[in-house]
């Protein structure tokens, strides 16, 4: 059953579909990651609340994508992607110091990152038990670490929105860096990927292939990996709202940047209104002068 159309009960008085529940689960994972990365030992309650609030406001935190949820009746499968912005920022600072020969620059600490801590079996089990109390059924939880925010539209929109909340950042520079810093294939590489998919011959299976010796070739995961979208080819970021620093004028701005091959080519329509090879992500934020919205579109080949 597709997760877009599945439905379940939070309780017997309140029925919600799974897309609505995905937002709740996303906030649950984000809150769990925030609390686990705050030191609460021998600290007063007021200091703990202040530390958690500061952790939520920082840009170098763990970002969680909107979970992909499937309801199989007896169990629920939840898949979410994680991105560690603190680890990426430390790596970028180390590369910049090495490039300019600054030996006195602080080096990234060698140890466990925020995401690796969450991927431990002990922490995953605790998080899964919390979800099982919500769903009232077994939960199959899968957390996947991403190396770049441009690999998921939800994470990229959240990163851009968090950076725009800081008044020291220029909106145009934030949106430009989110698009042009993405490592994307050129037009020739995209053409080769599409051509290779078109030339791929359909596989025909025999009854002898569905044996224990050939399980690796005929299981559902291997087949889905062959037909799935292989690579991000374009990134588009758009921001609209109160992005200016002026307080006297009730003025709205719109900034947009795009990078990579075009994603306007013909593609199969998903759910009647959306292209299957384009992933969209939306986020919003608030500055001192008002609110703004972020829209991200990732094209795939």
Name what the model sees in each region.
Residues 1-301:
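Ribosome-associated RNA-binding proteins
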């Amino acid at each position: 059953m597709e997760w877009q159309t599945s439905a379940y009960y939070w309780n017997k008085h309140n029925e919600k579909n799974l897309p609505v529940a995905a937002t709740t689960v996303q906030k649950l994972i984000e809150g769990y990651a925030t609390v686990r990365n705050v030191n609460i030992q021998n600290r007063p309650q007021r200091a703990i609340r202040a530390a958690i609030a500061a952790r939520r406001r920082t840009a170098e935190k763990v970002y969680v994508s909107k979970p992909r949820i499937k309801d199989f009746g007896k169990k629920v499968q939840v898949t979410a992607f994680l991105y560690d912005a603190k680890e990426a920022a430390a790596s970028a600072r180390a590369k910049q110091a090495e490039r300019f020969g600054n030996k006195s620059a602080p080096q990234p600490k060698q140890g466990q990152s925020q995401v690796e801590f969450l991927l431990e079996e002990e922490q995953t089990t605790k998080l899964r038990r919390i979800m099982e109390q919500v769903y009232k059924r077994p939960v199959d939880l899968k957390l996947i670490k991403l190396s770049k925010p441009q690999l998921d539209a939800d994470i990229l929109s959240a990163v851009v929105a968090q950076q725009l909340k800081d008044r020291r950042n220029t909106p145009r520079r934030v949106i430009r860096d989110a698009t042009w810093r993405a490592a994307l294939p050129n037009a020739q590489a995209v053409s080769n990927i599409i051509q290779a998919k078109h030339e791929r011959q359909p596989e025909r299976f025999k009854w002898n292939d569905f044996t224990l010796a050939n399980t690796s070739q005929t299981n559902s995961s291997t087949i889905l990996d062959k037909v799935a979208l292989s690579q991000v080819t374009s990134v588009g970021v758009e921001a609209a709202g109160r992005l200016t620093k002026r307080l006297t004028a009730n003025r709205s701005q719109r900034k947009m940047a795009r990078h990579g091959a075009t994603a306007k080519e013909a593609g199969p329509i998903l759910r009647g209104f959306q292209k299957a090879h384009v992933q969209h992500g939306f986020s919003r934020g608030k500055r001192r002068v008002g609110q703004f919205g972020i829209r991200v579109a990732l094209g795939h080949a």
